[in-house]
Amino acid sequence: MRLTIVGCSGSYPGPDSPASCYLLEADVGDGEDKRVWRILLDLGNGALGQLHRYVDPLSIDAVLISHHHADHCLDMCGYYVMRKYHPTGPQPPIPVWGPAGTAERVARAYELPVDPGMTEEFDFHTYDGPFTIGPFTILPIPVDHPIEAYGMRISAGGSTMGYSGDTAPCEGLDRIAANVRLLLCEASFRDTDENP
């Protein structure tokens, strides 16, 4: 499993980084039978443009949205346009996993009617226990944020990583972090006003 940090700015994109977006890749097979599976953890504002530096955005197999704040999901709007109106024609739908209401949230962000919204470009699923995408096994875990939010444990190729999403310290974060090889963890909302 390989990780590329596409963007990690909090709340809004910065001059050198878009908002949250993490690319995970895992290989299956060898030689001519080799296939690279790719998933995105979040697709925050500014991330779609930066993603081009690493992979063709049309090669993404699934998108996992941790929660509905713009810095974690807003570039789904641009991705919708890319998949719907690409010069090679409309692209087949890919799975998008997220909290309840993800399909409605991204449709509203683009001022689309909720029905059909973006359902012809994306196959929306609500987190409800573990699931697989190619070689990846994903376990979504609720975390502590002002809105419904999830962190997750992602396993592939014998390794497990954790992604906190946005959260305060909580039991869910402890579960995400337990015995992982790598933990991507939010670091904000400090107790003091002094920043390092």
Task: Go through each PLM region and give its residues.
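Binuclear metal-dependent hydrolase catalytic cores
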Residues: 1-164, 168-170
